[in-house]
Amino acid sequence: MNGSRRGGGVDRTIRSLFDDAGVRGWLHVAELDRPSAHVVLDPDEQVPMGSVYKVPLMTAFCRLAEAGRIDPSHRLTLETADRVPGPTGLSILRDPVTMSLRDLVVQMMSVSDNTAAHAVLRAVGPEAVDRVCADLGLPHTRIHGGVVGTFDRLVADTGAGSLDAAMDRVADNDTVVPPDVYDPAYKASSTPADIARLL
């Protein structure tokens, strides 16, 4: 991979692909052993990070466990009322589930389980995740309550009565969506450069 220059051939090709798809895209790709060899498109722009927030959350959990500040075998019982919407994991179960924190982390990372991630975030605390981001040199990475914070904000920004209604509103091409819905300032967000550094 060659280091890119703004307006270079690779940049133009990727931007053209995004344009053809009718989307705006951001990118930061680098060789692991030679980070200066990279291709970037708006690498410092703040963007929603979706489930990628679970990576620094896992790192914060591991650091706290290693320091003896959290017991990875501590068991939590998650009632049906604790479920966070999502297509995988505990979100699709009907009965109370009891799991250790470390098993919740496995669920969170292996199937991107939103309910498990929310339970781990409550146990770890957002401040611990912020410290990890600072320690890893990720100055533009913010968690803002994880997926629950993002979903709550989506419902509020769309004026919908529920998450399902908010999702329907955002997915409807004939509905004008308030611009705050896509504002990374209030959601788990980062920059392509931070995310590449993290991964």
Predicted regions and their residues:
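Mid-domain, small-residue-enriched loop/turn segments at the edges of structured enzyme/sensor domains
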Residues: 22-24, 121-198
